[in-house]
Amino acid sequence: MTYNFSKTAQFLQTAKPLFSPFQSSSALFLAAGLSISTILPVFAGTAQKTQLISQGGKKVEITLVSYAVTKAAYEKIIPNFVAKWKKEKGQEVVIRQSYGGSGSQTRAVIDGLPADVVALALALDTKKIEQAGLINPGWEKEAPNGSIITRSVVALETRAGNPKKIKTWNDLIKPGVKIVTANPKTSGGARWNFLALWGAVTKNGGNETQALKFVNDVFRNVVVLPKDARESSDAFYKKGQGDVLLNYENEVILAAQQGKTDVSYEVPSVNISIEGPVAVVDKNVDKRGTREVSEAFVKFLFTPEAQREFAKVGFRPVNAAVAKEVQNKFPKITQLYTVGSLGGWDAVQKKFFNDGAIFDKIQGGRR
């Protein structure tokens, strides 16, 4: 079944977010400095939005660092948490936010961006912050659901009406099909795409030899391999390159909510669970004395109230009750697998993406 953008957007959200899902703002955040009084800055590209959340009295300030497409959900979630904390603790909370590409946000935190909470696109980025000594080992066990707050899957985004009839993974290797995907050596999101292609074989009755051949064949049809998700989307949308873009389902839905109607999409029924983790940055919260409110905010992200907001912008909720509420709103996945079932991020990185690993060999064969 080919999904039309406008119809998908209608059931998930009635109001359209007002930002580009690919705008990065970490540089703007750093340039703006860290001072704040009674307002909540929300940085997204050149656009800034402020929301009054503190009117004097004692207050506590924390900083959330996340990746771009989560912004629409947090705009709804944060005021609800602020109100809840005020009611229960009698304390004003100011939550500063920084949004951008997950990889660039990771580097910014390691380089000194004083995040109290990080909610990044993949656990590998969170592990890099852990390895830098800012997050304690075992962070995955500090929150429910293995500290995963959002899920998505890989979608095949095509031109309107799907003229090339690209509906399954196997359609990607047809002669004449032109594919756009970011480079998994430089893009965290593209690693999910690559693993989805690999699992399309190994999690569907095939072996690794067959998987290697299939992924090789797919990349022979890749016409452009940009460094990140933003550039791959620009290549597909703005430059008109390719017949199909490998993308996150939630990003496709978010684009629909922003009025993008000239493309369609398919969700293969064998797919990888794209998992977005959250963690408290231990070194920073202990230094600033913000652990209590930071941990409470993380806990709040798992509530039905917060999970519904994530669902509205296209994420598949991790809360069981909310997932049941919206189960008919998303295409059904018959075989859903995780990075854990592929050996975990450390093993995956070594096997596929390190220098000289499988992806480099595939690239060598394309030259």
Regions found by a protein language model. Give the residues of each.
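Ligand-binding pocket segment of bilobal, Venus flytrap-like solute-binding proteins
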Residues: 204-269
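Bacterial N-terminal signal peptides that target proteins for export
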Residues: 4-29
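Early extracytoplasmic/lumenal segment of secretory-pathway proteins
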Residues: 44-132, 142-143, 248, 367
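Bacterial N-terminal signal peptides
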Residues: 25-41
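Extracellular/periplasmic juxtamembrane helices and adjacent flexible linkers that interface
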Residues: 55-56, 285-367
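A bilobed periplasmic-binding-protein/Venus flytrap-type ligand-binding module shared by bacterial periplasmic
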Residues: 153-162, 275-292, 309-312
